[in-house]
Amino acid sequence: MPLEMEPKMSKLVFGCQRSSTSDDDSGCALEEYAWVPPGLRPEQIQLYFACLPEEKVPYVNSPGEKHRIKQLLYQLPPHDNEVRYCQSLSEEEKKELQVFSAQRKKEALGRGTIKLLSRAVMHAVCEQCGLQMNGGEVAVFASRAGPGVCWHPSCFVCFTCNELLVDLIYFYQDGKIHCGRHHAELLKPRCSACDEIIFADECTEAEGRHWHMKHFCCLECETVLGGQRYIMKDGRPFCCGCFESLYAEYCETCGEHIGVDHAQMTYDGQHWHATEACFSCAQCKASLLGCPFLPKQGQIYCSKTCSLGEDIHASDSSDSAFQSARSRDSRRSVRMGRSSRSADQCRQSLLLSPALNYKFPGLSGNADDTLSRKLDDVSLASRQGAGFANEEFWKARVEQEASEDPEEWAEHEDYMTQLLLKFGDKNLFQQQSSEVDPRASEHWIPDNMVTNKPEVKPNHQGLASKKYQSDMYWAQSQDGLGDSAYGSHPGPASSRRLQELDLDHGAAGYTHDQSQWYEDSLECLSDLKPEQSIRDSMDSLALSNITGASVDGESKPRPSLYSLQNFEEIEAEDCEKMSNMGTLNSSMLHRSAESLQSLNSGLCPEKILPEEKPAHLPVLRRSKSQSRPQQVKFSDDVIDNGSYDIEIRQPPMSERTRRRAYHFEERGSRPHHHRHRRSRKSRSDNALNLVTERKYSAKDRLRLYTPDNYEKFIQNKSARELQAYMQNANLYSQYAHATSDYALQNPGMNRFLGLCGEDDDSWCSSSTSSSDSEEEGYFLGQPIPQPRPQRFTYYTDDLSSPASALPTPQFTQRTTKSKKKKGHKGKNCIIS
């Protein structure tokens, strides 16, 4: 149709030029336009083109001319009217096309007419924009729309595509004007592949468009995709095979294509199969599905430890401390407001035992030693035979415990590095072979040589244990969680079996013949109830440091390595080495259970063990910046009703505070270990119960102070001692109802008071970790400033700096009436 119009337009232009009464400079030189509306005078043509956008005016060799040609091909497709322009039509389809084209021309085709509105026209309105048109303006009329319908020249556009109708050619349908393309699509579907009208009876409809059946095929291999699976890429269909070969991503782990049917993980332009094997830590191969990860140099890791390329299974306790940078100092000031003890402080006692693997205490640096110890443990298992009926029950409880606070387990490695950077070059972590105890390689003393063996009820539990009964089985250790300071998820690291944990076999010279491995593992926490000792309580504290779980009586009784004769010498030699940061656990110093038992053996006329050389333990000296003041907190969530069966009503679990609790024990048995929320239980209550259950002769028993003889006891004291006692009593007067729970229950505690009463200055000096010897108070060649000893220093629980336990004598135990006020039934003084 446009081809037929070109001669007419040429004739029109030639006629205008021939009939023009003006020369070329009159402004009516029509040869400058590639097309002009037919039937207009030159001045009318100028008025019409003046109403159009400049870029759409078809000047010769202008962008407007190119736009016109483009619109002619788009709005008036030649294959919609002529069979010769169609690619593959059957004879029947060719006939349909001819009929279709003729019908459209007859019923809808038209050309717009340019007219000047008469001055008499007062109410003409543009059909497109709805604005009023005044007389004398140029308007476009469409004969098929009616005589009174008109448009602005710039508003004469297709109803569907809103483009100017090229050369004023329109198709009228249902009161709207359309271009030729969109008018044909109102009647027949158009193939998206060949752009031709579909005259066949069947077609494929996909993605909101239509295709010939044979044209809906893969763009690459031309496989017909009708009824098949396909993938659209840039508006074109592909079969699954071609798409995978052309556009599918490669897995970063296995290097294979990630199929269209396979889920994939994508991060920063990298892709992985969404499987545990592919989307896993590049170092330890732990699955990272659903877990945070640490990207580094194109690889992903579960923790910062793995990102450094270190094998945690092959490292010892010293190596594992090098796994992070010095970021602890920058974060330490931010954490000052926290009152709970952080996980890294609990780990410091483990750091001081090089024989232990930091992450996995069951794995020492010597693989042969580990293997031989395992074999021995297995041989012991055949002789024990009892208490393993609930093995499946223990394993079923593994997944029930919630993970630890991510803020705590994610930070410990930076602090470990800080310790090594400060003290590692001073050989403080090296065990010297010349000081190895010859008895360290021997087994423990047989049970028949143990003196003061306690009598323990086999199925007895204190209130504290009963309270946390549901939480006593498993707790994911902070040491076993992910190490990344960037938010590594604990999931991957928790897959490293906690069953690899043995009890700390290097704490006090005990080596390879410990109780069988299964018995010491976390799968047997309260299955077995053998006889307990003070040493068991201390070991459970160390194990709690490692695993975050409490062990109720799983170790066999272990005798003390120290006697009363060398106790003072050891104390004078090693007390100076203690750190106020809590780097030495009470179970690892001579002021722990060892001191307690040796002190008891001195008080009782019984057999004293031969004097032995103390086991060598490397320690950390305290620098001035590391010492922090002590703190005291009060908590009402732990009451030790261990052996007395006194009815004390407990508040509901939702109303109890989650504080770490300490029971004051005898002198030298002051654990620096705090309970870590619900999953970590201090074993100080065990030691307390054991003290009360020891049997003494009448002459060796210390006097219990009743309200009557207590007054006589006070009168016999010096003025200086009396002042200290009264000052202490005043401080604890408001908690008299809390301490009264132990007034007549705990003879061991009163025995402790009697010891303190004999020398009130001794407990003040021994309760701190400052040096007892002026001559040894040097660090890095500089003398350590000696702080003034303070008997009672109390701070709010704003600071989280660890402090040594302050066993203040509780002389308010005269009060025997226990108050039943809710939430204040029996408070214990705990040290933070």
Swiss-Prot record:
Alphabetical list of PANTHER family matching this protein: LIM DOMAIN-CONTAINING PROTEIN, PRICKLE-LIKE PROTEIN 1
Residues with a covalently attached lipid (S-farnesyl cysteine): C829
Sequence ranges assigned to domain LIM zinc-binding in this UniProt record: 124-188, 189-249, 250-313
Any one GO molecular-function label of the UniProt entry: zinc ion binding
Gene name of the record: Prickle1
Subcellular localization(s) per the UniProt record: Nucleus membrane; Cytoplasm, Cytosol
Domain PET: 14-122
The protein's name in its UniProt record: Prickle-like protein 1
Maturation propeptide residues: 830-832
Source species of the chain: Mus musculus
